[in-house]
Swiss-Prot record:
Gene from which this protein is expressed: dadA
Catalytic activity, reaction form: a D-alpha-amino acid + A + H2O = a 2-oxocarboxylate + AH2 + NH4(+)
Biological process per Gene Ontology, one example term: D-alanine catabolic process
Keyword Flavoprotein: yes
Alphabetical list of NCBIfam families matching this protein: PRK00711.1 (NF001933)
Name of protein: D-amino acid dehydrogenase
Origin species: Sinorhizobium medicae (strain WSM419)
Family: Belongs to the DadA oxidoreductase family.
Amino acid sequence: MKVIVLGAGIIGVTSAYQLSRAGHEVTVIDRQPGPALETSFANAGEVSFGYCSPWAAPGIPMKALKWLFMQHAPLILRPRIDAAMLSWMAKMLSNCTSRRYAVNKSRMLRLADYSRTSLAALREETAITYDERMQGTLQLFRTEAQLDASAKDISALAADGIPYEVLDRDGCIRAEPALGRVRDKIVGGLLTPQDETGDCFKFANALAGRAEKLGVCFDYGTEIRALEVDGGRVHGVVTSKGRRAADAVVVALGSYSPLLVRRFGIRLPVYPVKGYSLTIPIADASRAPVSTVMDETYKIAITRLGDRIRVGGMAEISGYTNDLGIARRRTLEHSVMDLFPGGDAAKGSFWSGLRPMTPDGTPVIGPTRIAGLFLNTGHGTLGWTMSSGSARVIADLVSDRKLEIDATDLAIARYG
């Protein structure tokens, strides 16, 4: 089949690679001049199969109110008259129950664990290197209350068979020796040892190169204008360079996916939540992280990427704006320098990207009411983590092959 993948971020590139391996003639279309130049460009670098949780969780509404008044808040809300924003926020609040949290986290862990084995197979198959490390994620707690609140996550990990270790202060320091100098600032942590780290941009570019060798065509610098739909079936894509015919189309446009499909009555509850990152050179390796540390207080990930530290996080709900707020940079600098002052923050590269978030935290992967039109989007902060498994799921669905995991509850049909 002739398949068009819309979007050349990490989700689009991995999808194209797996579709090509499945025997399809694949074209990737993206407005940027190369792969992974938007949300996938400078994400936090964590490939967190175990540290995988919905933002919609019990207690979050009250925490959100408190965060709004914090100096270094993990959440920034800039309300506006925007029906999509208000609808998305209402749906997210409805998922902040213990029952919904358990269902959503189980879905996410299922896909993340599948992605773990899929990424391992892909790495072995392609021999791609991308500043990868396989030393786990340490969720770091500064207070006893944070440690106690991790019980629900521990229960979910145990139920899904995901390895974990609950660490005391000394255990955290053994995992991340640089924390020894700030031992009084931490009380414990939760280590998910199967988690990894790596540079998403490097990986996406290397895999795009492998995909081209398989015959995938990358049509960069091309605006996507509309889908061509007739008789309940997709027939192609209208672009700034003309029409492209297709037997199937995979929409992997991140936060922009809903804007493309809504004219066909597809109400895709994906909304942009801006995240920020700061990439700084390491000046003193003894005071730098070994792998990824999640600072639970500020909801910030601090990740070792070769000779760099990538600090990423925060959630700014402000629509489709990509401006850089200097206050957000100060928050990132505060978190990393407080725990790991081995980097030169003054030389840091500051960046922001729009994460495509669903209200329940689970991505939308699967068919739509339009024959031949598929979605692979809405991965939020976990696009890098879930990309390899999501790509195999979408390739199997497009190819009408038996899936290796249950993906029925990942489709848009779950929203009714």
